[in-house]
Amino acid sequence: LRDILTPFGAALLATALEALGRFAWGGPYLPELMAEKFFTLIPVWAFTPLFRTFGYGSKYYAFGGMIAGEVAALTLVGMAVRRRMCRRQASGGASRLTAVVASSVAAAILIGILPLLDAGIAGQALPGGLWLAVPTFVVVAGSYAAVLTRGPSR
């Protein structure tokens, strides 16, 4: 249980900062983009029974599920990073890991995940464009990495 607390806290912080960016200055919010993509992928024959079962709130359930999915994915990535950090602490290589983790997470989101969600590379297809997407995800990834690498060690 102790191994999951710091990565889970980092994931919650990253998701909360992302939401703050969305509502404060209109930055991108991955769970929102994922829910939009999810609804475009569901065929009409499958969507009708889902809508009957869950009613009007079905889009909110999907949105909540996407938030939980993002937190879970960031927690799993964080647990893997923390394991690697614990192995490298003896050699003193953990100090540079913050920058490596932050840049890797930001690059994965901006170059890998956003294009899959039809947002373009670095959020070019979003209303705010890359001028909002890049700073938002750099701050999110930097905060996430800082909590992961500065949190209590095992």
PLM ranges: what are they?
Residues 28-55:
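Extracytosolic (periplasmic/ER-lumenal) interhelical loops and adjacent juxtamembrane/interface segments
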Residues 61-72, 76-77, 93-153:
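Membrane-embedded alpha-helical segments of integral membrane proteins
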